[in-house]
C-alpha cells in the first residue's frame, strides 16, 4: 500500500516537473515573441519617420492586430485580459475550460497585443499559459480533480516564476491560492 502511494507521488512529481519545463519553454517563447514583435513595430516607426507613407502600414497593422485579438476573444472570451481571474476560478473548481484553444490563442494573441504596445503585462498571460499546460498534462495523464488542480497550480506558479524570473513569487502565489 505504501509503495503504491509512493509510486503515485513520484508520478505526480514527474508530471509536475514536465509541467514546469513545458511552461518555461512556452513562456520563454512568449517573451521572445513579444520582444521581436516590439522590435518590429519600433522598426516600422523608424521607417515612418523617414517616409510618412509607412504610417499607413502601421495603421493597417494595428487594425489587423485588433481584428485578430477580437476574433480570439469572441471565440473564447476567457482568452482576453490577464487570465488571473480564470485561473483562480479553475483552482477553486468553479470554472472549466478547454486547455489547448486557450493556450495557443493566449500565446499568439498575447504576443501580438503586448508586442504592439497595448497596456497589458506578460505576467498574467504567463500565469494562464502555465495553468493551461498543467491542465493539458493532467488531462493527458487522466488525473482526478485534486491532482488536476495541483498540476494547474504548478503550471500557474511556473508561469508566474518564468514571467518574473523569480521562483519564490510562483511558490507564494500557490500558497496564497
Where are these regions (language model features)?
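Alpha-helical transmembrane segments and immediately membrane-proximal extracytoplasmic
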Residues: 1-177
Amino acid at each position: 500500500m505504501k509503495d503504491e502511494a509512493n509510486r503515485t507521488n513520484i508520478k505526480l512529481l514527474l508530471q509536475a516537473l514536465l509541467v514546469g519545463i513545458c511552461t518555461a519553454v512556452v513562456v520563454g517563447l512568449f517573451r521572445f515573441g513579444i520582444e521581436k514583435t516590439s522590435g518590429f513595430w519600433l522598426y516600422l516607426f523608424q521607417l515612418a519617420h523617414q517616409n510618412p507613407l509607412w504610417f499607413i502600414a502601421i495603421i493597417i497593422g494595428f487594425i489587423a492586430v485588433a481584428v485578430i485579438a477580437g476574433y480570439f476573444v469572441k471565440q473564447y472570451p476567457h482568452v482576453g485580459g490577464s487570465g488571473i481571474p480564470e485561473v483562480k476560478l479553475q483552482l477553486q473548481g468553479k470554472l472549466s475550460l478547454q486547455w489547448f484553444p486557450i493556450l495557443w490563442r493566449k500565446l499568439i494573441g498575447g504576443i501580438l497585443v503586448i508586442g504592439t504596445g497595448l497596456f497589458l503585462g506578460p505576467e498574467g498571460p504567463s500565469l494562464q499559459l502555465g495553468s493551461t499546460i498543467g491542465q493539458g498534462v493532467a488531462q493527458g495523464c487522466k488525473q482526478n480533480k485534486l491532482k488536476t488542480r495541483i498540476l494547474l497550480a504548478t503550471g500557474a506558479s511556473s508561469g508566474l516564476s518564468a514571467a518574473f524570473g523569480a521562483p519564490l513569487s510562483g511558490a507564494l502565489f500557490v500558497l496564497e491560492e
